[in-house]
Protein backbone atom coordinates (compact mmCIF):
# COMPACT_ATOMS: atom_id res chain seq x y z
CA UNK A 1 0.00 0.00 0.00
CA UNK A 2 1.27 3.45 -0.92
CA UNK A 3 0.34 6.67 0.87
CA UNK A 4 1.02 10.33 0.18
CA UNK A 5 0.64 13.29 2.54
CA UNK A 6 0.73 16.93 1.40
CA UNK A 7 3.08 18.92 3.65
CA UNK A 8 3.35 22.23 1.74
CA UNK A 9 0.43 24.33 0.55
CA UNK A 10 -3.27 23.87 1.24
CA UNK A 11 -4.39 21.68 -1.65
CA UNK A 12 -2.73 19.91 -4.56
CA UNK A 13 -4.52 18.22 -7.44
CA UNK A 14 -2.72 15.60 -9.52
CA UNK A 15 -4.03 12.75 -11.69
CA UNK A 16 -7.60 13.53 -10.61
CA UNK A 17 -6.87 13.27 -6.88
CA UNK A 18 -7.06 16.31 -4.62
CA UNK A 19 -4.74 16.29 -1.65
CA UNK A 20 -5.36 18.46 1.40
CA UNK A 21 -2.61 19.60 3.73
CA UNK A 22 -1.85 17.12 6.50
CA UNK A 23 -4.20 14.37 5.28
CA UNK A 24 -2.62 11.04 4.28
CA UNK A 25 -4.23 9.29 1.33
CA UNK A 26 -3.78 5.87 -0.18
CA UNK A 27 -2.51 6.28 -3.75
CA UNK A 28 -1.90 3.93 -6.68
CA UNK A 29 1.67 2.86 -7.37
CA UNK A 30 1.81 4.99 -10.54
CA UNK A 31 0.98 8.17 -8.58
CA UNK A 32 3.36 7.18 -5.78
CA UNK A 33 6.18 6.92 -8.31
CA UNK A 34 5.17 10.24 -9.93
CA UNK A 35 5.26 12.07 -6.58
CA UNK A 36 8.47 10.37 -5.44
CA UNK A 37 10.74 13.40 -6.02
CA UNK A 38 8.13 16.04 -5.13
CA UNK A 39 9.18 18.00 -2.00
CA UNK A 40 5.55 18.90 -1.26
CA UNK A 41 4.75 15.33 -0.18
CA UNK A 42 5.78 12.73 2.37
CA UNK A 43 5.41 9.30 0.80
CA UNK A 44 5.27 5.94 2.53
CA UNK A 45 5.09 2.38 1.32
CA UNK A 46 3.73 -0.28 3.64
CA UNK A 47 4.78 -3.80 2.84
CA UNK A 48 2.27 -6.48 3.69
CA UNK A 49 0.99 -9.75 2.33
CA UNK A 50 -2.39 -8.37 1.34
CA UNK A 51 -3.46 -7.72 -2.22
CA UNK A 52 -4.24 -4.17 -3.32
CA UNK A 53 -7.89 -4.65 -2.42
CA UNK A 54 -9.96 -1.56 -1.75
CA UNK A 55 -10.45 -0.73 1.89
CA UNK A 56 -13.98 -1.29 3.16
CA UNK A 57 -15.38 1.06 5.75
CA UNK A 58 -18.34 0.47 8.02
CA UNK A 59 -20.92 3.15 8.64
CA UNK A 60 -19.74 3.57 12.23
CA UNK A 61 -16.12 3.99 11.08
CA UNK A 62 -17.19 6.65 8.60
CA UNK A 63 -19.22 8.48 11.23
CA UNK A 64 -16.10 8.61 13.41
CA UNK A 65 -14.10 10.31 10.65
CA UNK A 66 -13.83 14.03 10.06
CA UNK A 67 -14.80 15.96 6.92
CA UNK A 68 -11.25 15.95 5.48
CA UNK A 69 -11.07 12.15 5.74
CA UNK A 70 -14.45 11.80 4.00
CA UNK A 71 -13.29 14.18 1.26
CA UNK A 72 -10.10 12.20 0.77
CA UNK A 73 -12.05 8.95 0.30
CA UNK A 74 -14.51 10.63 -2.08
CA UNK A 75 -11.65 12.07 -4.14
CA UNK A 76 -10.10 8.61 -4.37
CA UNK A 77 -13.44 7.29 -5.60
CA UNK A 78 -13.36 9.83 -8.43
CA UNK A 79 -15.93 12.38 -7.27
CA UNK A 80 -15.64 16.00 -6.26
CA UNK A 81 -16.11 16.30 -2.47
CA UNK A 82 -17.85 19.67 -2.86
CA UNK A 83 -20.77 17.85 -4.52
CA UNK A 84 -21.90 16.74 -1.05
CA UNK A 85 -23.57 19.12 1.40
CA UNK A 86 -23.04 17.30 4.69
CA UNK A 87 -21.57 14.27 6.43
CA UNK A 88 -24.69 12.14 5.89
CA UNK A 89 -24.50 12.63 2.11
CA UNK A 90 -20.76 11.88 2.07
CA UNK A 91 -21.20 8.72 4.15
CA UNK A 92 -24.13 7.50 2.03
CA UNK A 93 -22.10 7.97 -1.17
CA UNK A 94 -19.05 6.13 0.22
CA UNK A 95 -21.14 3.20 1.48
CA UNK A 96 -22.95 2.98 -1.88
CA UNK A 97 -19.62 2.83 -3.72
CA UNK A 98 -18.33 0.12 -1.38
CA UNK A 99 -21.50 -1.92 -1.98
CA UNK A 100 -21.22 -1.46 -5.77
CA UNK A 101 -17.60 -2.65 -5.82
CA UNK A 102 -18.54 -5.74 -3.84
CA UNK A 103 -21.01 -6.91 -6.49
UniProtKB/Swiss-Prot annotation:
Superkingdom classification of source: Bacteria
Protein's UniProt name: Uncharacterized protein YqbF
Native source species: Bacillus subtilis (strain 168)
